[in-house]
Amino acid sequence: MRFYQKWTGIRISDGKKSEEFCAFVPGNIQYDYGKYVGFGDPMYGENCKKYEALENDSWAYVTRLSYERKDSESVWFVSEGVDYKYDVLINNEKIYSYEGMFKPFELDVTDLLTGDDELCVFIYPHPKREGAAEGHRDQADASCKPPVCYGWDWNPRLLISGMWQEAYIETRTADYIFKCEPSYSLNEAMDRATVSFDIECSTGCKVNFYDAEDNLLYSGGGKSFELESIKLWWCNGQGEPYLYKWTVENAGNKKSGTLGFRKVRLLRNIGTHDPAGFPKSRYPAPFTIELNGRRIFMKGSNFVNPDIFWGHIDEKRYEELVDLAVNANMNIFRLWGGASFCKKEFYDICDKKGIMVWQEFMLACNAYPNDDGYLSVLESEAVAMIKALRLHASVVLWSGGNELFNSWSGMSDQSLPLRLLGSLCYTYDKHTPYIMTSPLEGMGHGGYKFLDEREEWRDVLQIFRSASCTAYTEFGVPSITSYESLKKIIPSEDISEITEAPSWKLHHAIGAWRPESHACLETLKRYFGKEGTVEERIKQSEWLQSEGLKAIFEEARRQWPKCSAALNWCFNEPWITAANLSIVRYPAVPTPGYFAVKNALRPSLFSARIPRFDWRSGDRFTAEIWLLNDSNKEIFGSVEVILLIGDKEVPLLKWENATADARTNTEGASVCCTLPAVDADSITLILKADNGMENEYKLLYERKKTVYAPKGMNM
């Protein structure tokens, strides 16, 4: 039986202890302390900077144990994870120490108990590499603490720690089941499975195995059995994410879970070749997911920590976010290495909903060391992660981390941390693919703006139609958050204009990455004029994000099968940002950009390849018309292409009886016309079609050619 304790917290600063305050488990102790002393809403203004004064402090969770037990039962302290370096003490006696936040532990404390016992979890200050720049994420490059906590362009610097996962006292009988882990192998036809259970228990156990409809398929004391005519687990859009159910039980204990049968491989992209002439190099790194013998176009997003306080994330939040991905026709999340691991409930939900998971380890944008101390912690944490996730059908890819083969990280395939992670994935989950980092050769990260001065002021429509990557695994277009959300974070005296005021900067509108990130006011002025209210800038940025992301996703789909993936940066955010690249605002609010992505990721649709976003009277407007299909059936349809200019509709094309084979695209005809001089600020290309395959594109139109030019831009 489980007994949840009431905890108090203590801050230890310069050797001095604070008064005890109420601490919640799961949770983060800095949040509890901030609430106790009155830091205020961490989202508002600059309140979250108050937590910086706590970075070098130690903390203690303390409880007077409360439980009931029979004489025949043992007593255990169980924790799913504590962040980050800590000791566990019973009655001031240290019984366990660990560095890391992802490894669970369970401690038999029976013989240490007196009947009036104090349990303490003592947490050391946050790891900071000696010599690293103060306040910089380089401080995280010698530890396994997720570096996002040290500050990112969408996450404030907020070093948190504590009992972020569930913890409890548990009484156990002699027949307690300590381990119960199923595994399976499939025959070549993938219609028969051999299922095995690894069980640790002092007495015999009964295994029951059910299909999703609760029909009993096997029951007995054997730990291995065969199943005929099995159903496979499929990702969203490709079939049913079918999950079998199991129980393992004896007279006093019972464990249960689910199991999905699937086979996954990472294959070389069709259309990629080694160089034609000598001297030769290799072809681009393989990056096509094959699920159950079927090549899948990965369409999804980068998932980041859903809260700045990781202990507050619960199953409800995870389910809201995963449901949004499913409804947006996505089939994969990349769990970015800077934030890395989620709680168990997230993976359970992805299993159930059919969202594949590309899981990165906790390395990102840093040069991680080869020294034995770091490698020892990394190995322990990585093994815990692999063992926790290898049973999940949704976890289809492991990665060493984010952007480790780039100039700002400087690692390589000879770096010991990445070699270690590869060996661990092979040892503990060898049938799931592993890559050392993203991007690999051939893959692309970026860009992160609609209009980029470093790309000769080309917009994303121009940039991506000329790109040719095997996968676009990060790209983004920012937008400014809603005015209602801004009122929750920006003081009233600053909200009337986007400026370099501290709250705007702290919430990532100005100087988050480049000086203009992420509000990108220069881009908005370029397209819409120098003057504009905050409300107008919000609408303008939403327009750019919507059309930009739609264009990129559809372009990546047109490049299938050479291109195998499109994942925007990013899906969600951990707090209310003033401006960001996310398509779901905190906590789980879809943006207009989200709905544009949802439309772009429909299984089948007509699509237009448009040369650029902004047009003027007298321009020769052109567009290629395509039929995109990543469904598993041949599709048929007809489309009428119309250009709406002001209140005038200009018919451009009728494409009748268009067809596309399963998971194949068809290129149709091109359309063109000379744009007249009309009184309008936009034109809309309309693709009228039946069967939910319609589409439209709202583009900027200017009658006059004089526009505002940002400094340094030639017109």
Q: Residue locations for each model-derived region?
A:
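Soluble or luminal CAZymes and related metallo-dependent hydrolases
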Residues: 57, 317, 377-381, 413-417, ...
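Substrate-binding clefts and catalytic carboxylate motifs of secreted carbohydrate-active enzymes
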Residues: 11, 15, 159-162, 398, ...
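Secreted/periplasmic carbohydrate-active enzymes, especially glycoside hydrolases
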Residues: 1-333, 558-559, 563, 589, ...
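An acidic- and aromatic-residue-enriched active-site/binding cleft used to recognize and process polar
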Residues: 82, 91-93, 100, 112, ...
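Active-site region of glycoside hydrolase catalytic domains
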Residues: 178-180, 246, 258, 383-502, ...
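Flexible loop/turn segments at secondary-structure boundaries
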Residues: 84-86, 127-130, 267, 305-308, ...
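Active-site mouth of glycoside hydrolases
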Residues: 106-107, 132, 138-140, 147, ...
